[in-house]
């Protein structure tokens, strides 16, 4: 019996010694401080209430992100609003040639601050951010990145 | 519902193309009509009045409409979209019932120059949010509600005149739509006015022409809930025909479109609206 107690205690001590603190890292958010390289102000289109600041920059690991500021608003009650990087303020789709003037970033699900991780890094040719309703094919707003 | 043409401007719903008149039903008299309507357009006027070419929006609707005289001066009216099927060409179709319009109409003047006042609340019985899945992009969907989610009240003053024995009539009306809001968004009130002339051919076929115009009152909020018709303005032009199969039964055909004649189009899909129906009318309770 004493041997069993000793063995159980040894196992408990062994597990206690191996216990480590688990830290979850959300890779969709910047690690450390986000530094903006370019920024712009969203211009509303089609009465969607789109407004706010967008920034293109990197975190402390040099990973690139697109940031929507805490003042970002748009009408999300209409359905999905998708974020694109574009070579101009106009949404120019050319799927037959791989949409060279667009890069889909992803759907935006809330107003206020949001980050989109850009992997691979966005090409320098993308000068604008466009908010786009893909089902109706109408723009909700755009911002020039300067 | 808010427009008698396209219900929600962006999400648009073809509702009953029924006109307003100064006539009321005598006690026990009634009229019912079942109709189907169809609409498709890729021409959208945004809130600023700029025309955009979008994906094609489509709507089909089945509706019921009825009038019944409950007193010498009182008529009850109901218009109920039984089914609305909405889609873009890029999305799957979504369906639902529409908003029920219940109306009480009071005859202020009767005789050769009837004048009537009606109050018509529109109840939010339709689907307030109805998301349609994009056919090609899995994360894309768009809200195509079949009701606007609000309780609004139309108040209408209408006058008519029959040129009997010449088989023709004319009606004019003015309406005020008191709107409330949905989900924190306050909708602006609207005014609407219109006229209709009708003429009977060989005792069997009534034909009519209609002109209407709607204006939104007040300044827009931010953001404007445009999918629920806030800010919708237009001038409408329509034509109709009703052919009597029997003394009580008629077939109806109607057409409507929009233009910029009185109020320019804003927050509206514009295009041809076709409807067909069958109506039954009786002179006393049977």
Which residues make up each language-model segment?
Chain B
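Transmembrane beta-barrel strands of outer-membrane/channel proteins
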Residues: 32-38, 78-82, 117-123, 172-176, ...
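Residues on the lipid-exposed face of transmembrane beta-strands in outer-membrane beta-barrel proteins
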Residues: 34-36, 64-68, 78, 102-106, ...
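Sequence/structural signature of outer-membrane beta-barrel proteins
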Residues: 39-43, 84-89, 122-128, 141-142, ...
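Outer membrane beta-barrel transmembrane domains
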Residues: 45, 192, 196-286
């Amino acid at each position: 019996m004493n041997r069993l107690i000793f063995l159980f205690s040894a196992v408990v001590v062994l597990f206690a010694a191996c216990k480590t603190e688990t830290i979850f890292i959300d890779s969709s958010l910047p690690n450390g401080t986000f530094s903006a390289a370019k920024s712009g102000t969203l211009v509303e289109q089609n009465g969607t209430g789109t407004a706010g600041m967008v920034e293109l920059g990197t975190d402390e690991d040099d990973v690139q992100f697109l940031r929507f500021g805490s003042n970002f608003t748009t009408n999300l009650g209409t359905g999905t609003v998708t974020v694109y990087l574009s070579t101009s303020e106009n949404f120019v789709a050319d799927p037959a040639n791989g949409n060279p003037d667009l890069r889909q970033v992803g759907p935006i699900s809330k107003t206020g601050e949001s980050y989109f991780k850009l992997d691979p890094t966005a090409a320098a040719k993308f000068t604008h951010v466009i908010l786009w309703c893909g089902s109706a094919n109408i723009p909700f707003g755009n911002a020039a990145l300067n | 519902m808010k427009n008698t043409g396209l219900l929600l401007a962006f999400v648009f719903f073809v509702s009953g193309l029924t006109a307003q008149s100064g006539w009321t039903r005598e006690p026990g008299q009634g009229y019912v009509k079942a109709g189907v309507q169809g609409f498709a357009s890729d021409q959208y006027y945004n809130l600023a009045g700029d025309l955009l070419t979008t994906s094609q929006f489509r709507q089909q609707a089945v509706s019921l409409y009825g009038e019944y005289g409950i007193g010498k001066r009182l008529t009850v009216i109901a218009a109920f979209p039984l089914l609305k099927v909405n889609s873009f060409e890029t999305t799957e179709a979504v369906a639902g019932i529409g908003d029920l319009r219940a109306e009480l109409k009071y005859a202020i003047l009767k005789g050769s120059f009837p004048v009537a006042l009606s109050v018509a609340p529109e109840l939010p019985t339709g689907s307030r949010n109805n998301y349609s899945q994009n056919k090609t992009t899995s994360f894309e969907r768009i809200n195509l509600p079949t009701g606007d989610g609000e309780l609004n009240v139309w108040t209408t003053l209408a006058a008519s005149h029959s040129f009997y024995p010449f088989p023709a009539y004319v009606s004019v009306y003015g309406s005020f739509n008191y709107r409330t809001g949905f989900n924190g968004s306050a909708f602006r009130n609207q005014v609407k006015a219109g006229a209709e002339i009708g003429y009977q051919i060989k005792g069997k076929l009534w034909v009519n022409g209609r002109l209407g115009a709607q204006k939104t009152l007040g300044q827009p909020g931010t953001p404007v809930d445009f999918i629920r018709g806030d800010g919708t303005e237009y001038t409408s032009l329509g034509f109709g025909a009703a052919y009597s199969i029997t003394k009580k039964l008629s077939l109806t055909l109607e057409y409507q479109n929009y233009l910029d004649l009185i109020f320019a189009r804003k927050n509206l899909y514009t295009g041809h609206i076709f409807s067909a129906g069958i109506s039954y009318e009786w002179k006393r309770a049977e």
